């Protein structure tokens, strides 16, 4: 540690970034070294240089704001006597033990046959008998019958459309004795047709399931007579019992910090306005490994606590061991603090929830002691690109039908989507911890899509899982453009394929086995559809290029003509169109019946629906190709990158669109040319597919433009109720986001090293509390020396993370940078301040006058 004399200009610059009085600054300006400066700040002239800089963390942090932090009882000391901020409650550990997966049914059968018992499972309760369970089973049998019956009829029509009718004209005795090529020529058309028919049946059944779900949702919402809806079980606004403590947890990882803490603040203030704030605690659970973002999170946490007086109510924790991604983050919370709460509400990084919605969820849990999870139906809002606004419109208009329909078929054995839901803590801790999947390869290891699995485990343990589809006040955001949505889809695709390994796990309820199956089909339907189109093209080539055999038997008097029944083709095509698009029409009819003013009026909502239908037709083949790639990548073991999704209105550059969509465009051109060469008349049937692929680049770019989205909004196109009459929570989120961006902290790690107050905050919030053992001290010295030598631009991520987590090393690096006036660090810090003049040089905050507040609203 350097003890060289301090340059007067360096000392003056350092003191300028501490909110001191003129007298204090003049007194400290007489220091001859930074060691002396820290000794005076710490009021300990006998302290060594290393001890002084650590001891000065408290004065540097609290100068000008000591009363505020002391009043909130936020200051404490660790086991070594170092000052720290109480950013989380005291740890009260609860045992969280995941049950190992036994996914191989053959091994279980073999162990049973050989008299070796399987490992015992944790004790589970039986869900008490209830009428809804019987009703749900009957409804699901009806759904299965409707799907299968509809598919059989459609398959029969499809069989009649195909040119080669059955295998009766294939002589299998002759096949044995004839040359192989003749066998291929004879069998090939029938094999193609059989494959096409099988694929058609699978895909039609999948479409049929969606149709019947939407239809029943339409009837539920139109009549409003759902006697089994979970939201009807609460008495209303009864007081929440003191023991019904609820933790709102927001797992984040390298997110958009201004938006995250804006939504958190809006939610906090809405809960305060509801009068139930004393029943809720808020936890930001960070898995961030970008040190700049991590420092910005620390500052944002301090800001939001000061602005809302949320000290002791809003907590922050950043993990250093990032195991099992989001589910591991939740496990860590449950292990440390879960036993202190009766319920947990999981929020996504873009989630916003009203205080009334959260209070209603707690009341519903209290009124339904057999409910383990209650999922809300979050409304998408807040984005302005044309693509996002069309998707917001689609989810807002069509989504309620499908959500209500899911509830109709599933009742208390339903979905959980991982956020905007309330969970009963005790059974979740005991039964829903996720062990890694056994084995090796792409489908082994930590579970990626945890939500469906946790819902299945909750139901297996004897607790209900419900969707409160009609509960208002739950919001989320969607990706701003097609490519960002597809990046998210790749993660979800891999996760859903992994989850299917649990299909045969013992004890899973049949409904949740079906949920695993539908999760797989959400993505597997894409390669099946693509294969269906490829085989159809191959059948066209067969009919065009292969010489037809009109006489296949000796002495045959009449030729066997390939058959074509256009009336059946038209009927089947019309039926498929009805299944695909009738739910959208029913959604608009429902809006007409309930009132269309909030959607721009009847004419505008109808026009928006037609435009969205055209847009979805354009994008369906593009998604098909991408999802096919994702499925193949998962099976080939290509890793899916789990980066945080885009949270703002970024448009797609032309260069990126060409890179991502270029192969699809070439495929569309080649496919169209092939079909035109084979049979130009067939090109009309394939035009929606190949045309969409050819146009994918401009459609992707143009739809990502915010200007077009706002222009459509001005014309009341794709309008949703949250835009027509924006809820106070969303208004506050939008304003706080703009304010946070204005004061956003950039180059956070450099500031945590150089800036006097930012360094004090980072040291006080550091989580590594190691002692003074020789190996630890040697490692600290090595890291500090490396940081001084290579500067901020040459420092690797692991060293950055280690320094940010260690208050001792970080404070020593801070002292040494200033003592040596290290230009590599200080110049970057100065440049950051000059380039970003609106970010806080210190953790100081503007007056809150004029800012929207939900407290007392």
Curated annotation (Swiss-Prot):
<feature type="transmembrane region" description="Helical">
    <location>
        <begin position="197"/>
        <end position="219"/>
    </location>
</feature>
<feature type="transmembrane region" description="Helical">
    <location>
        <begin position="514"/>
        <end position="536"/>
    </location>
</feature>
<dbReference type="GO" id="GO:0009250">
    <property type="term" value="P:glucan biosynthetic process"/>
</dbReference>
<dbReference type="InterPro" id="IPR001173">
    <property type="entry name" value="Glyco_trans_2-like"/>
</dbReference>
<dbReference type="InterPro" id="IPR050321">
    <property type="entry name" value="Glycosyltr_2/OpgH_subfam"/>
</dbReference>
<keyword id="KW-0472">Membrane</keyword>
<keyword id="KW-1003">Cell membrane</keyword>
<feature type="transmembrane region" description="Helical">
    <location>
        <begin position="141"/>
        <end position="158"/>
    </location>
</feature>
<dbReference type="GO" id="GO:0016758">
    <property type="term" value="F:hexosyltransferase activity"/>
</dbReference>
<keyword id="KW-0997">Cell inner membrane</keyword>
<dbReference type="Pfam" id="PF00535">
    <property type="entry name" value="Glycos_transf_2"/>
</dbReference>
<protein>
    <recommendedName>
        <fullName>Glucans biosynthesis glucosyltransferase H</fullName>
        <ecNumber>2.4.1.-</ecNumber>
    </recommendedName>
</protein>
<keyword id="KW-0812">Transmembrane</keyword>
<feature type="transmembrane region" description="Helical">
    <location>
        <begin position="681"/>
        <end position="703"/>
    </location>
</feature>
<keyword id="KW-0328">Glycosyltransferase</keyword>
<comment type="pathway">
    <text>Glycan metabolism; osmoregulated periplasmic glucan (OPG) biosynthesis.</text>
</comment>
<keyword id="KW-1133">Transmembrane helix</keyword>
<keyword id="KW-0808">Transferase</keyword>
<comment type="similarity">
    <text>Belongs to the glycosyltransferase 2 family. OpgH subfamily.</text>
</comment>
<feature type="transmembrane region" description="Helical">
    <location>
        <begin position="570"/>
        <end position="592"/>
    </location>
</feature>
<dbReference type="GO" id="GO:0005886">
    <property type="term" value="C:plasma membrane"/>
</dbReference>
<dbReference type="InterPro" id="IPR023725">
    <property type="entry name" value="Glucans_biosynth_gluTrFase_H"/>
</dbReference>
<dbReference type="InterPro" id="IPR029044">
    <property type="entry name" value="Nucleotide-diphossugar_trans"/>
</dbReference>
<feature type="transmembrane region" description="Helical">
    <location>
        <begin position="605"/>
        <end position="627"/>
    </location>
</feature>
<comment type="function">
    <text>Involved in the biosynthesis of osmoregulated periplasmic glucans (OPGs).</text>
</comment>
């Amino acid at each position: 540690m350097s003890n060289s004399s301090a340059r007067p200009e360096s000392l003056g610059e350092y003191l300028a970034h501490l909110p001191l009085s003129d007298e204090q600054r003049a007194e400290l300006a007489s220091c001859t070294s930074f060691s002396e400066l820290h000794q005076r700040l710490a009021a300990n002239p006998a302290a060594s240089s290393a001890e002084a800089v650590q001891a000065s963390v408290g004065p540097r942090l609290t100068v000008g704001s000591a009363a505020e932090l002391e009043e909130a009882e936020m200051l404490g000391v660790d086991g070594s006597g170092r000052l720290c901020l109480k950013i989380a409650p005291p740890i009260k550990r609860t045992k969280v033990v995941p049950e190992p997966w036994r996914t191989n049914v053959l091994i279980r059968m073999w162990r049973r046959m050989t008299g070796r018992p399987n490992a015992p499972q944790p004790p589970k309760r039986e869900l008490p008998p209830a009428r809804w369970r019987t009703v749900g089973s009957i409804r699901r049998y009806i759904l299965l019958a409707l799907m299968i019956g509809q598919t059989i009829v459609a398959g029969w029509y499809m069989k009649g459309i195909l040119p080669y009718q059955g295998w009766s004209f294939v002589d299998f005795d002759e096949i044995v004795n004839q040359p192989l090529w003749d066998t291929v020529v004879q069998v090939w058309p029938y094999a193609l047709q059989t494959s096409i028919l099988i694929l058609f049946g699978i895909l039609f059944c999948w479409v049929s399931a969606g149709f019947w779900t939407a239809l029943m949702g339409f009837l539920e919402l139109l009549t409003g007579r759902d006697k089994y809806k979970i939201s009807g079980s609460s008495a209303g606004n009864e007081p929440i019992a003191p023991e019904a403590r609820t933790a709102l947890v927001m797992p984040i990882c390298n997110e958009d910090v201004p938006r995250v803490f804006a939504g958190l603040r809006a939610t906090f203030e809405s809960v305060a306005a509801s009068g139930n704030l004393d029943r809720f605690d808020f936890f930001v659970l960070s898995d961030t490994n970008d040190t700049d973002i991590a420092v910005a999170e620390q500052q944002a946490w301090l800001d939001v606590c000061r602005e809302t007086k949320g000290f002791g109510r809003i907590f922050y924790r950043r993990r250093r061991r990032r195991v099992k991604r989001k589910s591991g983050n939740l496990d860590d919370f449950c292990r440390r603090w879960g036993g202190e709460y009766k319920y947990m509400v999981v929020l996504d990084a873009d989630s916003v929830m009203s205080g009334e919605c959260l209070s209603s969820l707690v009341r519903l849990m209290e009124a339904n002691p057999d409910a383990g999870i209650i999922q809300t139906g979050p409304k998408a809002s807040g984005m302005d690109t044309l693509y996002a606004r069309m998707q917001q419109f689609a989810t807002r208009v069509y989504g309620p039908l499908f959500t209500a329909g899911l509830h109709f078929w599933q009742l208390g054995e339903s979905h959980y989507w991982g956020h905007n839901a309330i969970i009963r803590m005790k059974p979740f801790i005991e039964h829903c911890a996720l062990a890694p999947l056994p084995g090796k390869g792409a489908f082994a290891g930590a579970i990626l899509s945890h939500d469906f699995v946790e819902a299945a485990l909750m139901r297996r343990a004897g607790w209900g899982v419900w969707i409160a589809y009609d509960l208002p006040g739950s919001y989320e955001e969607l990706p701003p453009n097609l490519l960002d949505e597809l990046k998210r889809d790749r993660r979800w695709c891999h996760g859903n394929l992994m989850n299917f390994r649990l299909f045969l796990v013992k004890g899973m309820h049949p409904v949740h086995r079906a949920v695993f199956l539908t999760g797989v089909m959400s993505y597997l339907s894409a390669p099946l559809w693509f294969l269906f189109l490829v085989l159809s093209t191959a059948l066209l080539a067969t009919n065009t290029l292969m010489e037809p055999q009109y006489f296949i038997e000796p002495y045959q008097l009449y030729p066997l003509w390939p058959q074509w029944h256009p009336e059946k083709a038209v009927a089947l095509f019309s039926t498929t169109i009805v299944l695909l698009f009738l739910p959208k029409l029913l959604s608009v009819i429902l809006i007409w019946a309930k009132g269309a003013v909030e959607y721009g009026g009847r004419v505008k909502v109808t026009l928006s629906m037609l435009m969205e239908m055209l847009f979805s037709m354009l994008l369906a083949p593009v998604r098909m190709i991408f999802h096919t790639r994702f499925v193949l990548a998962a099976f080939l073991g290509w890793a899916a990158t789990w980066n945080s999704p885009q949270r703002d209105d970024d448009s797609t550059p032309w260069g990126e669109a060409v890179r991502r969509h270029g192969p699809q465009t070439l495929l569309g051109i080649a496919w169209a040319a092939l079909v035109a060469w084979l049979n130009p008349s067939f090109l009309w049937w394939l035009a929606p597919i190949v045309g969409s692929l050819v146009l994918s680049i401009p459609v992707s770019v143009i739809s990502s433009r915010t200007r077009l989205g706002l222009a459509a909004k001005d014309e009341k196109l794709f309008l949703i109720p949250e835009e027509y009459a924006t809820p106070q929570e969303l208004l506050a989120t939008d304003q706080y986001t703009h304010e946070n961006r204005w004061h956003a902290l950039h180059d956070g790690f450099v500031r945590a090293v150089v800036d006097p107050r930012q360094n004090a905050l980072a040291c006080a919030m550091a989580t590594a509390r190691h002692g003074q053992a020789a190996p630890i001290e040697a490692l600290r010295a090595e890291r500090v020396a490396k940081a001084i030598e290579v500067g901020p631009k040459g420092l690797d991520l692991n060293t950055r993370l280690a320094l940010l987590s260690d208050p001792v090393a970080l404070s020593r690096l801070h002292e040494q940078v200033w003592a040596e006036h290290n230009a590599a660090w200080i110049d970057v810090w100065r440049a950051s301040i000059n380039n970003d003049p609106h970010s806080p040089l210190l953790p100081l905050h503007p007056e809150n006058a004029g800012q929207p507040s939900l407290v007392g609203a």
